[in-house]
C-alpha cells in the first residue's frame, strides 16, 4: 500500500454550519470531511461551498481535511469540483459520492488535476463495479455508504454489521488489490454505545483501515478500534528487524521465536506499523 493519510476516525461535518465545521476541525479526528452533499439544503449549496473553501484555506494543516462534493449527476457538482481544484494542496482529497463507475472518478480527476480522490460507494451498481472503481487513478480510499445502499437494497436500518459481510468483503478485497484504503461508512446513530463500538471492532477485525463517524463523541472509540495494541506494534517491529538482519547477513530466510518469517508475515507487520504512523 502506498503512503496514505491515516484514517482511523473520519469525522463528517455539515459544510453549511460554520460552528459545527469549526468544532470538527478542532477535534482529534484523523480526517475531517466537510460535507456539501446530504447535510446541505439545495438553497444553501452555493453559500456552503464558499464557506467550506474558506475553512479549508484557513485550516492550519494539523489534520487531513477533505470535501464531499455533490453527486456528479447534480447541478452543483461542476461548481464543487471547480472550487476544490482552486484549493490545491491545502485540500487532502475530494470524496465523490454515489460513485458507480471508473469513469465517474476519471471525470472528477479530469476536473481537479492532482487533487486526490476517495470513492463513496453507496449504490448496487457501485458495488458491482467495485474492482474497476478501486483501480482508478488518484484514488486513495473506497468507503461504504450504508444509508443509501441499504435503502436501495431494501435492507433494514437495524441490520447488524454481520449482515453486510458480503459487501464489506468485496470492498476490502478490491481495495487491497488496488493498494488503497478500505474505510467503513458511518454507523446510523450518533451515540458512542455498544452497538457503535461493535460496528467499529467488526470491520477492524475484517481488515478495514478506519471508519466515518457523524458525532465527535464517537471519535475516540473509532480510533481505538483501528489502532493496534502495543504488543502488536512491538511484535511487528521485531518482525521487520529480523527480516532486515537476515537480509543483511545474506540469509534467504528469517526466523523469530522459532517461527519462519515469510512475506505474508512481513506484509502484516508493515500494515501494523503503518497504522501507527511507523515505517
Which ranges hold each PLM region?
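Expand to "…catalyze enediolate/carbanion chemistry for C-C bond making/breaking, isomerization
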Residues: 1-279
Amino acid at each position: 500500500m502506498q503512503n496514505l493519510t491515516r484514517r482511523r476516525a473520519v469525522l463528517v461535518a455539515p459544510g453549511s454550519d460554520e460552528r459545527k465545521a469549526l468544532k470538527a476541525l478542532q477535534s482529534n479526528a484523523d480526517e475531517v470531511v466537510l460535507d456539501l452533499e446530504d447535510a446541505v439544503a439545495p438553497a444553501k449549496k452555493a453559500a456552503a461551498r464558499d464557506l467550506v473553501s474558506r475553512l479549508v484555506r484557513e485550516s492550519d494543516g494539523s489534520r487531513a481535511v477533505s470535501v464531499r462534493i455533490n453527486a456528479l449527476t447534480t447541478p452543483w457538482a461542476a461548481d464543487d469540483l471547480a472550487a476544490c481544484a482552486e484549493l490545491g494542496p491545502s485540500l487532502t482529497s475530494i470524496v465523490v459520492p454515489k460513485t458507480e463507475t471508473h469513469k465517474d472518478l476519471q471525470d472528477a480527476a479530469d476536473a481537479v488535476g492532482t487533487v486526490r480522490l476517495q470513492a463513496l460507494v453507496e449504490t448496487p451498481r457501485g458495488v458491482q463495479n467495485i474492482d474497476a472503481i478501486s483501480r482508478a487513478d488518484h484514488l486513495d480510499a473506497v468507503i461504504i455508504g450504508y444509508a443509501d445502499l441499504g435503502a436501495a437494497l431494501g435492507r433494514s436500518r437495524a441490520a447488524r454489521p454481520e449482515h453486510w459481510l458480503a459487501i464489506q468483503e468485496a470492498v476490502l478485497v478490491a481495495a487491497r488489490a488496488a493498494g488503497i484504503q478500505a474505510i467503513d461508512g458511518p454507523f446510523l446513530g450518533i451515540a458512542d454505545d455498544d452497538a457503535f463500538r461493535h460496528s467499529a471492532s467488526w470491520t477492524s477485525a475484517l481488515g478495514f483501515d478506519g471508519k466515518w463517524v457523524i458525532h465527535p463523541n464517537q471519535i475516540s472509540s473509532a480510533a481505538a478500534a483501528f489502532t493496534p495494541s502495543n504488543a502488536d506494534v512491538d511484535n511487528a517491529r521485531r518482525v521487520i528487524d529480523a527480516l532486515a538482519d537476515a537480509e543483511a547477513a545474506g540469509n534467504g530466510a528469517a526466523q523469530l521465536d522459532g517461527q519462519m518469517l515469510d512475506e505474508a508475515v512481513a506484509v502484516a507487520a508493515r500494515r501494523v506499523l503503518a497504522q501507527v504512523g511507523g515505517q
